């Protein structure tokens, strides 16, 4: 088992026991977002030259108001010098929480903004295909796909965009020597 899975499973077990699965998930998302948004904070947190004692104090301050589980988990990562796997642990922990709660997060990329009604229709259709699981839709816009949509969930990618179809057609033509 990888270190990422080991840490994620340990955190999941502790959070489930305390009925704090979603709180810890929100905390970790917030902490990771702060690291991505502040280069200074990221250099401090990931920096190997920073003494463990200072990192622990900083974690205490940065996680004030968060679950003690989150605070302790981050300290353990630092104590074991495994800070670099935090984002991967977050992704694995997210998957575990979503699976446990019967939810699935689906990213939908379209060429134009989706209306609320269209988002709901897509959510319902995906839920039917995935056996009635609760679908959490994350939408984004990429005009370069021209039309259609690209769906990402778990380790899967479903490209039904016009750009994807055109690229597929181009590849098929190249294989047959048409172009």
Swiss-Prot record:
F(1)F(0) ATP synthase produces ATP from ADP in the presence of a proton or sodium gradient. F-type ATPases consist of two structural domains, F(1) containing the extramembraneous catalytic core and F(0) containing the membrane proton channel, linked together by a central stalk and a peripheral stalk. During catalysis, ATP synthesis in the catalytic domain of F(1) is coupled via a rotary mechanism of the central stalk subunits to proton translocation. It is a peripheral membrane protein. Belongs to the ATPase delta chain family. This is ATP synthase subunit delta. InterPro entries: ATP_synth_OSCP/delta_N_sf (IPR026015), ATPase_OSCP/dsu (IPR000711). Keywords: ATP synthesis, Cell membrane, CF(1), Hydrogen ion transport, Ion transport, Membrane, Transport. GO terms for cellular component: plasma membrane; proton-transporting ATP synthase complex. It comes from Rubrobacter xylanophilus (strain DSM 9941 / JCM 11954 / NBRC 16129 / PRD-1). F-type ATPases have 2 components, F(1) - the catalytic core - and F(0) - the membrane proton channel. F(1) has five subunits: alpha(3), beta(3), gamma(1), delta(1), epsilon(1). F(0) has three main subunits: a(1), b(2) and c(10-14). The alpha and beta chains form an alternating ring which encloses part of the gamma chain. F(1) is attached to F(0) by a central stalk formed by the gamma and epsilon chains, while a peripheral stalk is formed by the delta and b chains. It is found in: Cell membrane. GO terms for molecular function: proton-transporting ATP synthase activity, rotational mechanism. The gene is atpH.
